[in-house]
From Swiss-Prot:
Disulfide bonds: none annotated. This is Putative ribosomal RNA large subunit methyltransferase H. InterPro entries: Alpha/beta_knot_MTases, RlmH-like, tRNA_m1G_MTases_N. It catalyses: pseudouridine(1915) in 23S rRNA + S-adenosyl-L-methionine = N(3)-methylpseudouridine(1915) in 23S rRNA + S-adenosyl-L-homocysteine + H(+). It is found in: Cytoplasm.
Length: 159
């Protein structure tokens, strides 16, 4: 299994970097993991709809450069489907069993993801109806991927 996380924006806070490194190390027991950061666009304080659209398209271009053709794409979106940890584990396991060895998770920037990226998504995932900082979402996603592998392998995990 190969898992790629494409995320818009750089992690600046050490505590988030530490958590990302820890979960990356834990996941490496189960899967190859690549984390790709693409640059985010500077967003004005009160961007117009046109400015938002241009920003999202520029970020989408950067994301698409790193997307593998045969990868199963899971986008993190507010309007995506909310699932349990067990359901996410089942999804990952089912993909592996069906021969999909590459999964790419995409995390947008502060404005989310462009329509173009959303349209190529094989599965739209939401962690909550609440909004989280995209940097923190990377940690939350990694924890859930790690938890998924623990569940798949019948190993204990915190409930």
């Amino acid at each position: 299994m190969n898992i790629t996380i494409i995320s818009v924006g750089k992690i600046k806070e050490k505590y988030l970097s530490d958590a990302i490194n820890e979960y990356s190390k834990r996941i490496s027991r189960y899967s190859k993991l690549d984390i790709i950061e693409v640059a985010d666009e500077k967003t004005p304080e009160s961007p117009s709809d046109v400015e938002k659209s241009k920003i999202l398209e520029k970020e989408a271009e950067r994301i698409l450069k790193h997307l593998k053709k045969d990868s199963f794409v899971i986008t993190l979106e507010i309007l995506g489907k909310e699932v349990t940890s067990e359901s996410l584990a089942k999804k990952i396991n089912d993909l592996s069993i069906s021969g999909k060895s590459d999964i790419t998770f995409i995390i947008g920037g502060s404005l989310g993801l462009s329509k173009n990226i959303s349209e190529i998504s094989d599965f739209k995932l939401s962690f909550s109806k609440m909004t989280f900082p995209h940097q923190l979402m990377r940690v939350i996603l990694l924890e859930q991927i790690y938890r998924s592998f623990r569940i798949i392998n019948g190993e204990p995990y915190h409930k």
